[in-house]
Amino acid sequence: MQGPALRSPFRRWLPAIIALVVAVVAAGVLVLTSGESDDALVVYNGRSHYGGEEAFAAFTRETGIKVKLFGGDAQTLHDRLEGEGAKTKADLLVTVDGANLWRAKEEGLLMAIDSPTINEAIPAELRDADGMWTALSTRVRTPMRSTERVAADAVSSYEALGDPQWKRKLCLRSSTSIYNQSLVADLIAKRGATATETLLRTWMTNKPRILGNDIEVLNAINDGRCDVGLANHYYLVRQLSKNSSYRVAPAFPALSTAGVHANLSGAGVVSFTDRKAQAVKLLEFLVQREAQTAIAKQGEFPANPNVDPIKVVAAWGDVKLDPIDTEGAGKNATAAVKLMRKVGWN
């Protein structure tokens, strides 16, 4: 049965109501408490899957301090914070990619804090020397292999992906991926442009299949379209959680090498906040066991070395992390894109 027609006044305001709902959803606003939230700590959260925001909710339960999250991609939140300047409501910035943390520091968006709690919990290589930010988790961009067609020791370095035996059997994500751009920028910072170009050319000589995202790369290896590839490790965690028989495994660089490229998700106190003490308290909470355990559930490596990764990650054994050079990667971001184009990585 057809319901009664909408009354004219409601019909007149309906487009505005819909627009408002869409705007709220698009903004990614989440208040982790009931009641009024004007006094809530405001977090610009560019890492939206931290345990269903479990870590932030746990902070509210423990301290009584309310938290309001504004989600979005890292670039959008950075631009928003930069545009708002001193008028921003943000107290804490959570973002992805070490280069983004460096840029936020360089542009004066973060303030220095001196926290013995953070310094004790997080290794020096995973936090800013000036106290502007700290890592909350790390993710590695590692070679991947077929467990059916590739021996465990056949790929033990990034150089191994350029071995001629992988010609037309290598899968890579597009060069437009920020993950690939950050990897290359970090390689330039640590190895130099010439050595990095040589490495990338060996990959391109193998006529790699270029795909749209990391899941496509992993599926291509699983399905037999490729034998080896490159992907962030937590995407494999997700696939294995759906299918324990998934025929892909990480091929971490050998412990004798520099290690596997480890990028960061991290956070810093916004330089314009008038709630520094509460923001620091939240940041300190995020590096402790309860919050780090919640973050680790998403498959990333917790930044606090006293917190174990989840079982599927721990089962992979010892992994030597090579943390991103945040300043070097930030300064070489443009050079990385140009180099990838130069060698024909589309």
Predicted regions and their residues:
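A bilobed periplasmic-binding-protein/Venus flytrap-type ligand-binding module shared by bacterial periplasmic
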Residues: 144-149, 262-275, 294-295
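Short, low-complexity disordered leader/linker segments with a strong preference
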Residues: 1-40
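Extracytoplasmic ligand-binding site segments that recognize negatively charged/polar headgroups
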Residues: 46-53, 72-76, 88-226
